[in-house]
Amino acid sequence: MLTIVIGLAAADFITGIIKACVKNDLSSRVMRIGGLHKICEIIVMAVACGLEIGIELLGHYYQAAELAAVSGTVAAGLVFGYIVLMELISILENYGEISPDAVWVLAIIQKLRGFQKEDTKDVQAKTHTTRKRK
């Protein structure tokens, strides 16, 4: 899992640099921040893998190996799935801005952003009503 995350993070970083070169918007500050984000993603995935191993070892210690294996795998799998999805979307966004022929990619990204805005509105509405109740 960690190898895939590292590969996707590198691909996203490289496509981001290509996009910046194509748009004449290359900035060392933006590259530094992007690189730090990628390092944080790799650290989070490494911690999730360590958590999976730790939960499995605890399961063996407490004679609940099957439950521990499942819960550790689910935890690491969810983190892995989120990071992979996030990286793939970012790579597609970069590709859509690099290639003028990638209209289909931009259409998909706009739909995803529409879903994201709706989700954000729902979260903000729930937060606002919760604050009113307090």
Regions found by a protein language model. Name each.
Residues 25-45:
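Juxtamembrane helix-capping/reentrant segments at transmembrane boundaries
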Residues 25-29, 60-67, 96-103:
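Membrane interface segments of multi-pass transport proteins and intramembrane proteases
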Residues 18-22, 47-63:
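Membrane-helix exit/interface motif
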Residues 5-15, 41-52, 79-90:
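Alpha-helical transmembrane segments of multi-pass membrane proteins
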Residues 15-27, 31, 84:
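Hydrophobic alpha-helical transmembrane segments
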Residues 85-134:
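Membrane-proximal cytosolic segments adjacent to transmembrane helices
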Residues 57-87:
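Hydrophobic alpha-helical transmembrane segments and immediately flanking/interface helices
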Residues 1-2:
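Short, aromatic-rich membrane-interface segments at the entry and exit
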